[in-house]
């Protein structure tokens, strides 16, 4: 068996064991991070040992191969150890490229958070799935309920002609009449709420649908930072 085959076998077996035991957090009595370090050290030791055995014939070439494989092993181990940070970086990058995109991060305890990046207008916006349709919504902690524009209500299948606009609400355009409705389902990433109350604003009275406190207050965590908003179910 060549050095490459031995090295790849060690790494493959170690990776398989880490994947199998990912949820338990431990592999062969060690924390997964410690086991990953042990696997990498074993691979490095094997590589160095094989290089020493052949150093009498091709010392320079052996050192070069060792350096290359050391870099590969360290890169793989680093990617595993910092997997959550790399995932978060990738999600933030996508959020910056796609305005309103909700990104999902998983912390070291396995808990998921939805992260929204602040828009250029200074507000937090996201695309929520409402009764099966994607709706652009403005996160508004000052709004007591979820509020849909007249057009978005039509988009999700509601017929405004059959609604009773009996509720008076305050919008950016002043006082307006709104109709109470019940949404079957609203989701932002993995966070889903069913049978939740909302209102539909009269036509032309609301510029953008609002994600209000009737949804936000049900969350375990709502954390606002300078440039991002974190939601946890």
UniProtKB/Swiss-Prot annotation:
GO terms for molecular function: aspartic-type endopeptidase activity. Disulfide bonds: none annotated. CDD domains: retropepsin_like_bacteria. GO terms for cellular component: plasma membrane. It is a multi-pass membrane protein. Gene3D superfamilies: Acid Proteases. The keyword Cell wall biogenesis/degradation does not apply. The keyword Transcription does not apply. It is found in: Cell membrane. InterPro entries: Aspartic_peptidase_AS, Clan_AA_Asp_peptidase_C, Peptidase_aspartic_dom_sf, Retropepsin-like_bacterial. Pfam families: gag-asp_proteas. Its main location: membrane. Keywords: Cell membrane, Membrane, Transmembrane, Transmembrane helix. The chain crosses the membrane at residues 4-24, 35-55, 66-86. GO terms for biological process: proteolysis. This is Uncharacterized protein in cobV 5'region. It comes from Sinorhizobium sp.
């Amino acid at each position: 068996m060549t050095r490459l085959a031995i090295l790849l076998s060690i790494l493959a077996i170690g990776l398989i064991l880490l994947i199998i035991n990912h949820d338990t957090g431990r592999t062969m009595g060690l924390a997964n991070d410690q086991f990953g370090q042990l696997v990498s050290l074993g691979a490095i030791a094997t590589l160095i040992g094989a290089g020493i055995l052949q150093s009498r014939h091709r010392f320079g070439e052996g050192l070069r191969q060792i350096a290359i494989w050391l870099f590969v092993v360290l890169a793989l181990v680093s990617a595993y150890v910092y997997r959550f940070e790399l995932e978060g970086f990738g999600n933030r990058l996508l959020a910056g490229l796609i305005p309103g995109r909700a990104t999902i991060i998983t912390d070291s305890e396995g808990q998921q958070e939805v992260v929204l990046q602040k828009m250029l207008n200074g507000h937090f916006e996201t695309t929520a799935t409402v009764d099966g349709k994607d709706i652009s919504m403005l996160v508004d902690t000052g709004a007591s309920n979820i509020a849909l524009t007249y057009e978005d209500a039509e988009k999700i299948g509601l017929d405004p002609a059959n609604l009773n606009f009996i509720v008076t609400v305050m919008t950016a355009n002043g006082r307006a009449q709104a109709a109470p409705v019940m949404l079957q389902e609203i989701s932002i990433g993995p966070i889903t709420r069913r049978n939740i109350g909302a209102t539909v604003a009269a036509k032309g009275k609301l510029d953008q649908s609002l994600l209000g406190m009737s949804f936000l207050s049900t969350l375990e965590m709502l954390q606002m930072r300078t440039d991002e908003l974190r939601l946890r179910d």
